[in-house]
UniProtKB/Swiss-Prot annotation:
The protein's assembly and partners: Homodimer.
Protein name: Dihydroxy-acid dehydratase
Binding, Mg(2+): 78, 120-121, 440
GO cellular component terms, semicolon-separated: cytosol
Sequence positions bearing N6-carboxylysine: 121
Keywords, alphabetical: 2Fe-2S, Amino-acid biosynthesis, Branched-chain amino acid biosynthesis, Iron, Iron-sulfur, Lyase, Magnesium, Metal-binding
Molecular function as annotated in GO: 2 iron, 2 sulfur cluster binding; dihydroxy-acid dehydratase activity; magnesium ion binding
ATP-binding keyword on record: no
Encoding gene, per UniProt annotation: ilvD
Length: 550
């Protein structure tokens, strides 16, 4: 065992002495060391209940002959960080979390890990760190929040964001907005729709890194506690059998996850996180081109928020991820999982599917997969749109560019009534390095939707979007403006042509004009001069490479 390096032999008496200072007995020190990576915090609703899951996981570890050691990582709430300087820290926090997991596990000789994340960047961050170590681990995702209810209608956080736009154009009163604000998020859990947190939980289960039904089981359900306890027991088995992530994860495992993502209409942020996870195994293991190739393989089979009407709680009652895998069975490749069962064995155990929630592939919600990769002279290295959340009339759009160099400028223009039907809003210098931090543009997109412009106005950016964004929102444009990408030379009034079905996005000027503008472009200074974000801006890769540090 790895832990033998710090606890065996006479020379390790000082190490054992310090462990005994923590209250551990000789018998406990002899057992496998299991790190319990808890991201509990009192400021993130998706994480306020994680202490309960950590306690259950520790009981499971003890029950199966291991010794648990709990430690914490940070957790950022994207919703609370939204719309201000805090959002610069959201995506970069993923790398801090990965480094924390790596550092703590290496420093203390853990033989295996139980990861307990919930929200957007914490799920991929923890997994990235664990993959880097290549030691046995299992993931307990925190679980979804229930939707709120008011006057017989269901709400979630996106309802509140869009409510701001509705209030601004007089559709609702301030009192009605306050009612929605108060009811929309009723308690613990990651936001109730198929936004980034729940998308990543679903893909974690598909990858075989968490137990079946973990992703969709509600945050405070007793079954989630039982899953946590069983996960604690299972990690001891994985350590004793020396089953590492590289024994489980293959190219096919990642392709399964992408297929589920595309079929469900998951968050566009998955095109950052899945390549970033794969990068920890091998560079170029999974790229944006894999998403592009696979998006023609499956239709969109679930009408989940933000593009549809159903919530993750509905997906759970419909059969969860095993049911989705069952419906996609002809496309899914077999792979091993931490449960000890293969993907095909999990599929064969499915007993119930609600086809009103998870549609058969021959009767899909949309014939087109939920995400689409576009390329063109604006985005030579690609960009992404969550097409499942786009009105079909906007699949093809051509209009004049309204150019802004920050999110703040854009919001002022939208709420000030300066954006008109037919416009293409361009937000640049918001990429991984340009932001820095690649902020989510949820406030601008929600304002556009709330004001009723989502069926006539497109928005493109080198930044990214919340998993809760809907409408014709095209993000991750690569190369980003800060790297001298063509988005940097778009001028006010230029005509932009978007054709989602053809996978194209182009600036309607000549190649000669593009070359001339690029030759005259001057790189601006980094917006943040000190601290972590300034260092991040110097090291981060392009969005089409997962925005990893290199």
């Amino acid at each position: 065992m790895i832990s033998d390096n710090l606890k065996k032999g006479v020379s390790r008496a000082p190490n054992r002495s310090l462990l005994k200072a923590c209250g551990y007995t000789d018998e406990e020190i002899e057992k496998p060391f299991i790190g319990i990576v808890n991201s509990f915090t009192e400021v993130v609703p998706g994480h306020i209940h994680l202490n309960t899951l950590a306690e259950a996981a520790k009981k499971g570890v003890y029950a199966n002959g291991g010794t648990p050691f709990e430690f914490n990582t940070m957790a950022v709430c994207d919703g609370i960080a939204m719309g201000h300087e805090g959002m610069r820290y959201s995506l970069p926090s993923r790398e801090i979390i990965a480094d924390t997991v790596e550092s703590m596990a290496k420093a203390h000789g853990f033989d295996g890990l139980v990861l307990i994340p919930s929200c957007d960047k914490i799920v991929p961050g923890m997994i990235m760190g664990a993959l880097r170590l290549n030691i046995p681990f299992i993931v307990i995702t925190g679980g979804p929040m229930q939707p709120g209810e008011l006057h017989g209608k269901k709400y979630d956080l996106i309802s509140v964001f869009e409510g701001v736009g509705e209030y601004n154009v007089g559709k609702i009163t301030k009192e009605e907005l306050m009612e929605i604000e108060t009811c929309a998020c009723p308690g613990a859990g990651s936001c109730a729709g198929l936004f980034t947190a729940n998308s990543m939980a679903c893909l974690t289960e598909t990858l075989g890194l968490s137990l079946p039904m973990c992703a969709t089981t509600h945050a405070t359900d007793a079954e989630k506690v039982r899953i946590a306890k069983r996960s604690g027991m299972k990690i001891v088995d994985l350590v004793k059998e020396d089953i590492k992530p590289t024994d489980l994860l293959t190219k096919e495992s990642f392709e399964n996850a992408i297929l589920v993502d595309l079929a469900l209409g998951g968050s566009s942020n998955t095109t950052l996180h899945i390549p970033a996870l794969a990068y920890e195994i091998a560079p170029e293991f999974i790229t944006l081109d894999d998403f592009d190739r696979l998006c023609d393989e499956v239709p969109h089979i679930a009408s989940l928020r933000p593009g549809g009407d159903h919530f993750i709680s509905d997906l759970h009652r419909a059969g969860g991820i095993p049911a989705v895998l069952k419906i996609l069975e002809q496309k899914i490749r077999d792979a091993n999982t931490v449960s000890g069962k293969s993907i095909k064995e999990i599929i064969n155990e499915v007993k119930y599917i609600d086809y009103n929630i998870i549609r058969p592939v021959d009767k899909p919600v949309h014939e087109t997969a939920g995400l689409r990769i576009l390329k063109g002279n604006i985005a030579p290295d690609g960009c992404v749109v969550k097409i499942s959340a786009v009105n079909p009339k906007m699949y093809k759009h051509e209009g004049p560019a309204r150019v802004f160099n920050s999110e703040e400028e854009t919001i002022d223009a939208i709420l000030g009534g300066d954006i008109k039907e037919g416009d293409v809003v361009v937000i640049r210098y918001e990429g991984p390095a340009g932001g820095p931090g690649m902020r989510e543009m949820l406030s601008p997109t929600s304002a556009i939707c709330g004001m009723g412009l989502d069926d006539s106005v497109a928005l493109i950016t080198d930044g990214r979007f919340s998993g809760g964004s809907r409408g014709p929102c095209i993000g991750h444009i690569s190369p980003e403006a800060m790297a001298g990408g063509p988005i940097a030379i778009i001028e006010e009034g230029d005509i932009i042509a978007i054709d989602m079905m053809a996978k194209e996005i182009n600036l309607k000027i000549s190649e000669e004009e593009i070359k001339e503008r690029l030759a005259n472009w001057k790189k601006p200074e980094i917006k943040v001069k000190k601290g972590y974000i300034s260092r991040y801006a110097k090291l981060v890769s392009s969005a089409n490479e997962g925005a990893v540090l290199k």
